[in-house]
């Protein structure tokens, strides 16, 4: 996924509603633990732990999360142990990204972490697999403190199965020494510039469905119906979807466009000065800001003009990071308490300050001045009202591969305006195919 991988979750998206971790050491001192969480694919297994010496009942918890959050989560786990001295907590951690959580947990639920982070498009899949423990501790408080859309993304059939803590979508970074605020209002404005030293005016990961869907959403197309829950509906092949296809074919053919820019190319392009603007998210904010310095800027995605002359605002696919509790944990009350701690207001604020993560906590997200003080989070907030929350229905599993294939065919030139309708029909047919 990112990934196939928000004005009041970040303020208006979260109220309007528009798809990682571990710890070691202890709060004081302790002994090492050798248990480890498993990981595979793009995840890297690691282990480590520590035992609090505060006393009382001994409780061992395993926590999974992405590599980039490990140190932060260790700190939060240690603070949890210190805040609960009536028990002795030991923690083991494994490196498993949010994107890989469902795959790794479902390999063997009984052997998976007690607490793990996952992306919101996996909620229904994990629930249907019997992998998530229903939230029964402080549920009303969690619902009240977080945005409506994030709670919806963590729920199935009205029951809460996770603890949301990050709102996520993509937006546009740009080098303000190369482009003005007026230039970046539209793709046409960006692409019209001739900029010394720049080989790519605008970069986008065309064959990544998470990003690609933004063009279709901008034109008014729907993935799985109006609310994203109808597995029989996808209209990317209608008249407006066809105009999106036309636009992408022309855009990819422009030598000033970077058609297949993943995170590494975006970061290196800004670092060496050959890139003027690119679509990405908060996870790259630190490195891009370091590269651009005083010329660092970010804003909502640009508008683009369809072949009928209509100008539309590019949309985006939004999701949430959620902390879940294993349905087979031996310590459900402690695991729920830890998951709630890792996602509480204070720790969401810490993630905002240290990782540029946009909070789902309503009070934090409503602090417009603070949110806008972070350029990347401010841009995410601007884009939020144009975002569509990523669905978690099982049918979504069928979306990523056809989206990738469609993008690759445009890049390769095998999808042309002559056969575009056939390609779009095949795209939609594959998305709506019966799940195996």
Model-inferred region functions:
Residues 56-68, 88-94, 115, 200-202:
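Short, well-ordered beta-strand elements
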Residues 79, 83-146, 177, 182, ...:
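Extracytoplasmic "Venus flytrap"/periplasmic binding protein-like
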Residues 106-107, 111-114, 142-176, 200-205, ...:
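A structural signal for short loop-to-beta-strand junctions that line the ligand-binding cleft
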Residues 119-171, 182, 297-301, 372-373:
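Hinge/lid segment of periplasmic solute-binding proteins
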Residues 161-165, 170, 188-234, 275:
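Extracytoplasmic/periplasmic solute-binding protein
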Residues 230-260:
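Glycine-centered hinge/linker elements that transmit conformational signals in sensory
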Residues 290-354:
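Extracytoplasmic/periplasmic substrate-recognition and gating elements
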Residues 368, 381-436:
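Conserved C-terminal helix/tail region of periplasmic/extracytoplasmic solute-binding proteins
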